[in-house]
Amino acid sequence: MALETNTHRSYSIIPCFIFVELVIMAGTVLLSYYFECTDTFQVHIQGFFCQDGNLMKPYPGTEDESFISPLVLYCVLAATPTAIIFIGEVTTYFIKSTRENLIVQEKMILTGECCYLNPLFRRIIRFIGVFAFGLFATDIFVNAGQVVTGNLTPYFLTVCKPNYTASDCLIYHQFINSANICTGDPEVIEKARRSFPSKHAALSIYSALYATMYITSTIKTKSSRLAKPVLCLGTLCCAFLTGLNRVSEYRNHCVDVIGGFILGTAIALFLGLCVVHNFKGLYGAQCKPKPEDPRGVPLMAFPRVESPLETLSAQNHSSSMTEVT
């Protein structure tokens, strides 16, 4: 009887997951691949001034030479929230006090006539799957912004190596729109045209905020008041320092990092609040209190007015208690 109460039959969850969710996820990954690894989308050629001091910072080297290399960043971004969600869900499921609340929020799904989907399995797939989708979506938004704007990095003129003897650069305030004036490495120059928004800032704040929202909404610590805030603030601090590192190494402008923070924050909040509903169960949010039986409710209720006799008796009782003490 208890199994039937906590079981919900669904014939569409598996087909929807295979033919809708996985197809959307595959399309998102494929689009991200085209942005990252191909030249399908050409970067907008933005003009510049030959004597612009904001674009004359020293070349910091390739991305692999950065203090936070892309390989380390992507591994940490993907592994940290995944590990937190997996450990949190497994711990919540096997602790008796929290498992009862989980069973109320998440029902056992019966697909067809024989297959059961455990709430633990569904929550892990749901939360980690949405996180992975948001990670690729953030990467797409960042690449699209960089391709459309074509904002120049602080070291652009250093790698561009414009021909200062050309007629266009002889005039101090002449704005250059031609891409042929650069004499440096074309591959490095193209990367130097992708500054806004900062990819490191957007991905790091998205991952940190998603993990922070999961920790604050799911993990309960009754014995310690500071463990959860320290963990959340430490995660957000790492994302903040990642953005500052981009500015200190002259790889991005401050505006680029701020734009990346705003983009990553918006995507994390949207997915956390509107898609996974603040990491609450699907059925716990739909439970409504049972309406009160109207037969026992009076048609009209008036406020109770205390009579003078009751007031006098209460005063006499309090004075007698004072005399006794």
Curated annotation (Swiss-Prot):
One of its GO terms (biological process) is phospholipid metabolic process. Disulfide bonds: none annotated. The keyword rRNA-binding does not apply. Its main location: membrane. InterPro entries: P_Acid_Pase_2/haloperoxi_sf, P_Acid_Pase_2/haloperoxidase, PA_PP_rel. It is a multi-pass membrane protein. It is found in: Cell membrane; Cell projection, Neuron projection. Gene3D superfamilies: Phosphatidic acid phosphatase type 2/haloperoxidase. Keywords: Cell membrane, Cell projection, Glycoprotein, Membrane, Transmembrane, Transmembrane helix. It comes from the Eukaryota. Glycans are attached at N163, N316. The keyword Metal-binding does not apply. The chain crosses the membrane at residues 11-31, 67-87, 127-147, 201-218, 230-247, 257-277. One of its GO terms (cellular component) is neuron projection. May play a role in neurite outgrowth and neurogenesis. Belongs to the PA-phosphatase related phosphoesterase family. This is Phospholipid phosphatase-related protein type 1. It comes from Xenopus tropicalis (Western clawed frog). The gene is plppr1.
